Amino acid sequence: MSKLIYGLAGPTASGKTSLSILLAKKINAEIISVDSSLVYKGMDIGTAKPTLQEQDGIKHHLIDIIEPTGNFSVADFISSVNKLKKEIWARGREVLLVGGTMLYFKGLIEGLSALPESQAEIREALEYQKKAKGLQYLHQQLSEIDPQSAQKINPNDQQRIFRALEVIMISGKKYSELVKTSKVGGLDEELKLCALVPNDRSILHKNIESRFRQMLDQGFLDEVQNLRKNRMLTKETTAIRSVGYRQAWEYLDGDISYDEFVKKGIVATRQLAKRQLTWIRNWQSSINIVAMENETKELDILKYFGYK
C-alpha cells in the first residue's frame, strides 16, 4: 500500500501556521512549505514567515532556500517535494504540506504536462454522468479504458478521475501513456488535503488588516528598504511582486503616499485571499473543507487524516 501525504491549504491569515504545528506534532510529521514567497531569503516580515520559535521544534522545508533575485517554479517545487518526501519517510516521519500557493498544490495533484487543455463541454458531460450514475461509475469506466490510471487514482478523487477521462476523450489515447511521455513530477501517492475556509469572510478580512498593520509595527518597511539595496531587484522582480512588497516598493519610490500604501497593501492581500478561496471552491469535491472558526478543527482534520 502506498504512503499517504497530508496537506493543509487555506487563504492567507487563516491560521494555517499555528494549526499546522499542532497537526505535525500529533502525526509526527515534518512540514514542507507550499508558499512561493517563503522560499526567499531576507523576506521574513512581509511573508509572515514562521520564526524558529513559532516552528516550535517542527522541521520545516522550502523556507529561505533562494535569494530574492532567483525564481522557484512549480516544476522546481514538485521536484523538491518528491526528493524531500523520501528523506522524511526515511527518518520515520510523515509529510505535511502546508501553504496557500495553489499553483503548487495543483502541480502536485495534476503534475506539469503537455496534456490537452480542459474543455468545458466535456467537464459538463462528466458532471452530468456523475450526478446520474455516481463517481464510482466513472472510476469503473476509467478502469475498463485505462486500468493503470484507475489503479493509481482513489475512487473518491473526482478531480483526478475527471481529468483522466477528459484527456482520454480529447486525445483518444490512454491517460497513463500520455502522462508517461509528457508529465513532469506530480505525486504518485494519495494527497489527503484539508483546506481552511472562513464561514464569515469579514473575519478573514479583519485578520488580514490586523496582520498587515502588525507587520508594519514589526519593521516591514525597514525590511523592504534593505531589499532595495540590491540593485538587481525592481518592483517587477518575481519576489517583489509578492503582496505587500510591491506596494511598499511603490511607496518608497515616492509613487504613492503612506496611507495609499497601507490601503493598497491590505486590498491586494484580500484579493489574494479571494483567489485562494476560488481555487479551494473548485477543489471542494475532492478535498476536506474545514471552517477556520471551528473550535474542533484540529480534531476534525486529524480524523480525516486517519488519526484519532
Curated annotation (Swiss-Prot):
Q: Which UniProt keywords apply?
A: ATP-binding, Magnesium, Nucleotide-binding, Transferase, tRNA processing
* Substrates-to-products reaction catalysed: adenosine(37) in tRNA + dimethylallyl diphosphate = N(6)-dimethylallyladenosine(37) in tRNA + diphosphate
List its EC numbers.
Answer: 2.5.1.75
The record's annotation in PANTHER family points to:
TRNA DIMETHYLALLYLTRANSFERASE
List where the protein spans the membrane: none
Q: Which major enzyme category is it?
A: transferase
Q: Which cofactor does it need?
A: Mg(2+)
Presence of keyword Magnesium: yes
Residues reported in the UniProt entry to bind ATP: G10, P11, T12, A13, S14, G15, K16, T17
Q: Which family does it belong to?
A: Belongs to the IPP transferase family.
Origin species, per record, is: Francisella tularensis subsp. novicida (strain U112)
Question: This chain belongs to which protein, by name?
Answer: tRNA dimethylallyltransferase
Q: What are the protein's GO molecular function terms?
A: ATP binding; tRNA dimethylallyltransferase activity
Q: Does the keyword Methyltransferase apply?
A: no
What this protein is reported to do is described as:
Catalyzes the transfer of a dimethylallyl group onto the adenine at position 37 in tRNAs that read codons beginning with uridine, leading to the formation of N6-(dimethylallyl)adenosine (i(6)A).
